[in-house]
Every structure is written in structure tokens, then in C-alpha cells.
Amino acid sequence: MMNPSHGRGLGSAGGSSSGRNQGGGGETVVEMFPSGLRVLVVDDDPTCLMILERMLRTCLYEVTKCNRAEMALSLLRKNKHGFDIVISDVHMPDMDGFKLLEHVGLEMDLPVIMMSADDSKSVVLKGVTHGAVDYLIKPVRMEALKNIWQHVVRKRRSEWSVPEHSGSIEETGERQQQQHRGGGGGAAVSGGEDAVDDNSSSVNEGNNWRSSSRKRKDEEGEEQGDDKDEDASNLKKPRVVWSVELHQQFVAAVNQLGVEKAVPKKILELMNVPGLTRENVASHLQKYRIYLRRLGGVSQHQGNLNNSFMTGQDASFGPLSTLNGFDLQALAVTGQLPAQSLAQLQAAGLGRPAMVSKSGLPVSSIVDERSIFSFDNTKTRFGEGLGHHGQQPQQQPQMNLLHGVPTGLQQQLPMGNRMSIQQQIAAVRAGNSVQNNGMLMPLAGQQSLPRGPPPMLTSSQSSIRQPMLSNRISERSGFSGRNNIPESSRVLPTSYTNLTTQHSSSSMPYNNFQPELPVNSFPLASAPGISVPVRKATSYQEEVNSSEAGFTTPSYDMFTTRQNDWDLRNIGIAFDSHQDSESAAFSASEAYSSSSMSRHNTTVAATEHGRNHQQPPSGMVQHHQVYADGNGGSVRVKSERVATDTATMAFHEQYSNQEDLMSALLKQEGIAPVDGEFDFDAYSIDNIPV
């Protein structure tokens, strides 16, 4: 089965050529090179194996035949340097040709040519990818076998091009001894032939040595790589999971320091969480600021807009995102305020025109005449830096997000001396069950003020602010509709202002007209009044009682005329007039219309009716306000009823819906005014501020 002449192979032919070249010198090795090429053929088909052997011998190749793949592999292992190239079939019973290809490539590093009758692309591709240098389709042609020597030259040329790294001296000696042993084959050869054999065998052996050393280096590199991976995994810092509690601590620390002033070092000190590093906090802070910037995209452009929040008068507000000390963005982050609501609130605050009145005050600081209830905090609406009228109120800031957002039915009160509804009720209860508030005029039937030249109040001392008057009343009474400061420099008699309380004087701080009179709690309540002529040095007493003894909830419709449900007890005015034939008019209509009962140059005393009638319930408080005409001709008193706990509950039940309340107010504003001598008509359409 083995070819006995395979020992010489390419080495003998090349060696003899080389010897002749050295001796004679004219012939070249190239002419004799393919002769003696050592070929190992492996195929389970004996017919194919015989045909291949004959064709290869025709090409002057030295052929060794094997009909089993395992036998060929054992032969190669015994004599690694005995063959130059291997030709193997693909499909064999004992071992697949691709398996043999792998073993030869790993152990001997010889060029292998695959052959098969299967010419499918997948099989050819598989052979090439496994390391085959060529793929021959059966039946094999002579032209294909003549050129198989190219693969041997190409393989050795690539090996020679790589510089051979010599090992130790002992390894070099062993390789030389192996080269001498593998070159002979038992026959006597010339010195040139031995040199060529040693050269060819040394090439194969050096290649095997390099492949083995490369394997060792790869194994060592893998071990070192595993060690490096383990070291790198040990050097990695533990990952921080930002839970809800940890994020809340972070947000609290940022809010305490301020978003712009917060730095990772200070935040880490405030949080005081073990295992948390500065790098973790810095990374989370950067993401948190990006999140806030994305949420506050609307408010970033706020500084370039000229709106009422950022005018000179309202400069104390600061950015919209932190109204009244509340950080809306922080509320949004902690989940207390949705991101959609935050964007709507920020967008709602933009675009308000900055209107300024003639007196330098912003129009927003004047009480809105469209509604008697404020849907925003007066402190937020008017600002804290406006000290034009009276002293600044010292109150705690209340949370109010934006204009138009109802946070409670809060009454609009003037900026000066205020008296809340609860304080007025407390003052009434402290007065020995007196039904009149501090603004009520006590019974003065048996007493009169001192006569004589009364002291006068200058315009600076009597700067009465009454924002609830309509424009026509303000013009007639000498009050400006914008700043509510008397335009006339005329003085008012002291008798107009010296209104004292008979029972509870300590709870009536309104002598000599305070800088600002408090507005009644519910100005839309019924306003009964009396029209009485005025005469110098005369005392007047007027009392009006209702024709019905029952008490019902007060009507809030300004244009429905009803009788009063309870008495106005002990209404009396005593004053001196500085002019004759001048009258004081007291409005006597629920709709603020004029129903005057005047008598000139006559002493009028309205008799007292129904003293035993039912007294007003404790849940009702009467309010009276005095207005002095700037021309010195008349005095007007507006009497109103105030609902306390019981009536307030009824009011909330009647106007529990905000839309119903607004529609009722707008309906009242759209009715034409009632003509009268002294006009207490409803507010006209042209006076509605925009």
C-alpha cells in the first residue's frame, strides 16, 4: 500500500538539481522542481484511488495511497515530515474528510486538497473555511493535478517570509539532529542532496515549533485575560440604585441648598448615606438639572417677556416657578404636582399686559370691579412691595399658584388696615350681644355731638379708599376710580367722622376715618338706606324696620326688590353742617337705587317701629359705610348685611359652583344702570377692566 520510493520525493529531485548546479553550474532547479513531489492520497473508492495514482505518477510525483482516513492520520503522525501535500475525499465511512482536514491542519500544518463528486456550493464553502487549499470535482482532470505543486510553494514561501525565532541552544541542536535523520531514507546521497533534505525538513520542523509556541502563547494570553477580567471586576465600584427614598433625600438636599448653588460635595454631606460617592451624586445631579430644564422650558423665556409678574412694581415675585416660596418644579419632581399641571400653570402666567395707572400703581393692585371675590391671594396679586397706601400687612405668604385659579372664596380687601370676617364677628360678640358692627352708627336719639365750629380733616388725613364704588359715584363723591384718593382739597366736618359706639367702643377703631375703611364682607347683600334732609346744628334719628318678622337668607340679586327681613336697629346720625339747605341722602333700595325721602329745612324724626320685632339672628352682622361728597353737599350711608357662619353656609350652598357665581356676577354687570339722584347702580359694561 505504501509507495517505497516516497523517501526521495521533492528533496531528492531538488537535491540532485542543486548538486548539479553547484558542480557544473549551467542548469537550474526550476526545470526539475515538480518531479518527486510527495503526495498522500486518501479515498475509500479503490477505483478512484488507482486512477489518481496513475495520473500523479505521470506527473512524476511520488504517491502514497490510503483507503481509510484513520490509517492516513496514523501514518502522518508517525512521519510528520514525510509528505508535502495531502489529497483527501470528502465523504468517507470511517471519518469525514473535513475532520481529517482539521487534524492535519492542526498537527502537521500541511496543505490539504479536498475532492468529491458533490459540487454544491455549501460543501465547497465548508471545505475552504476549514482550511482546504483547493477543492477538486470528480472526475479529476490531469490539468488540475499538474498544478497542485503551486500550493506547496505558496505554503513554504509564506513560512520563509516569516523570520524564524530561534529558541534555546538545545532546541536548535535537536532540530538539526532531526533534520539529519529525516533527510536520508537509507540510501547514500551526496552532500548537496543532504543539504536540500535538511533544508526541507528544517522548514517543516520550524513551522511545527512555531505553531506549538503560538498555541502556548495563546493559552497563556487566555489565562492572563481571565485574570485581568477578574481584577477589573473587583476594581469596579458597586452600582448605586436610586430608590424613591434615596431620591427624596437628594431632592430635599437640593432644595435646601438651592438648585443653582447645590454642589455634589454639599449634597453628599446633607444626605449622609453610607456607600454613596461624590461621583454618584454628581451624575444624579446632572440628570436632575436636565430634567428640571426640560420641565421649565416655558419659564426659561419668562425673563424676556414684559408681563405683570416681572414689572418693576412686581419685582419681588421672582421667577414664576417659585411663587410664594413654593418650588413648583420640586413639587413636580416629588410627585405632588403633575408635570402637565406645571406646564399649564407656567403657560397660564405668560402674556398678561403690564398696565399702570396715572398714579404709578399697577392696575392689578386696584381691586377688580368685575367680581367681589378674589380667586387669588391678595398678597400674590398685589405684591408686598407696594407701600403707597397705609402700612404693609404683615401676613404669612399663602400658597397661590396663578391668577384665575380658585383657592377659596376670599374677599378682596384693601391693602391698609384690614379686618377679616372672623375679627368682625369677634368684635360683635364682645359687645354684649350688640347686633351692630364697628361700622354701624349707634343710637343717638338722646345725644348730639358738641356744636360749634368743628375741626376739619385735611385731604391727607381723610384719604378714604373705597374700591367697591362705581365710577359715577366715585366721580360725584370726589374719589378717583384708580387710586381712590380724594381729588378735591375740600375738608370734611369732624361730625361726619366722629361715630362712636355706645356699647362696645373698644371694638370700633374707625373714629376719625382710618386711612382705609374695610370693605364689608359681602357687598352684594341688601343695602337699605334712608334719605334725610340736613340742617345745621340739628340732631337726627332715623330708624327703619322691616314689615316682615321672619328671617330668610339674604338675596344676592341686585335687581330684585325685596323688603328687609329684619330691623335696622338704632340707626342715628348727629352732625353739624357748615352750610344751610343742604341734604344728606341715604339710599333705601336693595338694588342701590335711589328712594329718597327728603324734606328741606325741616326737622325730621322717623319714629321707631317694631321694637319688639324679631332681632336679627346672631349669624348676621350689619355694616354701614359713610361717604362724604367732595362738594360738601351730601352724606351717604350704605347699610349692608353680613352673613357669618350660618349665612355663609347658605351662601356656599347657593353658589357652590364657580361657574354659577361668575355667570351671576356677569349678568349683574350687563344690566343698564338705574337713573337716580345718587347713583348706586350696578357696574356698567364699560367699567369692566380687561
Curated annotation (Swiss-Prot):
Query: Which keywords accompany this UniProt record?
Result: Activator, Cytokinin signaling pathway, DNA-binding, Nucleus, Phosphoprotein, Transcription, Transcription regulation, Two-component regulatory system
Q: Where in this protein does the record put region Disordered?
A: 1-27, 160-234
| DNA-binding region(s) in UniProt | 239-289
What name is this protein filed under?
Two-component response regulator ARR1
Subcellular location as annotated: Nucleus
The species this protein was found in? Arabidopsis thaliana
The UniProt entry, under InterPro entries, shows:
ARR-like, CheY-like_superfamily, Homeodomain-like_sf, Myb_dom, Myb_dom_plants, Response_reg_B-typ_pln, SANT/Myb, Sig_transdc_resp-reg_receiver
SMART domains given in the database record: REC
CDD domains (UniProt xref)? REC_typeB_ARR-like
First-listed, main subcellular location of the protein, grouped into a coarse class? nucleus
Q: Where is this motif: Nuclear localization signal?
A: 236-239
GO MF terms here are: DNA-binding transcription factor activity; phosphorelay response regulator activity; transcription cis-regulatory region binding
Give expression by tissue.
Detected in the whole plant. Expressed at the root transition zone.
